[in-house]
Amino acid sequence: GANSVLWLGLSDDMADLKSENKVLRESTRVQGIVSVNGAHSFNSQNWKKMINMSDKIFDFMIKRFLKYPGMDVDKWLVNYKLKKYQEAIDYFDFMDSSDPPMLVANYGDMVPKSLSSFNHHPIHAKYLKQRADSLSIENYVFAPELGIESKDINGILDFILKQLSE
């Protein structure tokens, strides 16, 4: 959920104004983004940089994380690493100064207790904040484990009400 919200909110408008389908002509732009415990990126290279991880360890981690019946993880990894695919999914690299305000809250543990904990690590919030600040995107970030707590807004509800009133 949180990653999908970031992908949609940070993507360029996908409206197809020439479509005969009324739904496809609608804008996909949002007024604000709320992401709770999401990752900073879908790009494997960005993840490896964040946690200083080798390809071998990253592949091992993904293989353990994606262990589902019928899932061909090796095939998934090959497709996932394709540059064209990475460019299409990585909302971190989509970010630009035209993006809507965002609230990012990450309350994960500093020491991951499981493989899925990496997806919810507070450092993701730090990376999103740094990127948003560098692009002058209005942002409110809460990652208490890292000492990051926006003082300009009193949480998710205040953020949502602020975005809807503007």
What positions do the PLM features span?
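Conserved long hydrophobic alpha-helices within structured protein cores
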Residues: 1-12, 95-107
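Primarily recognizes the serine-hydrolase "nucleophile elbow" in alpha/beta-hydrolase
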Residues: 1-52
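Stable alpha-helical elements in mature extracytoplasmic
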Residues: 1-5, 26, 87, 91, ...
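Structured segments of extracytoplasmic/periplasmic soluble domains
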Residues: 7-11, 36, 94, 131-135, ...
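Mobile cap/lid helix-loop segments that gate and shape the active-site cleft of serine hydrolases
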Residues: 10-14, 44-94, 100
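Surface-exposed acidic, glycine-flexible loop patches that form ligand/cofactor-binding
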Residues: 23-27, 92-97, 164-166
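Short, proline-enriched alpha-helix->beta-strand connector loops that line the catalytic pocket
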Residues: 26-31, 96-102, 135-137
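C-terminal catalytic histidine-bearing segment of alpha/beta-hydrolase fold enzymes
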Residues: 102-117, 122-166
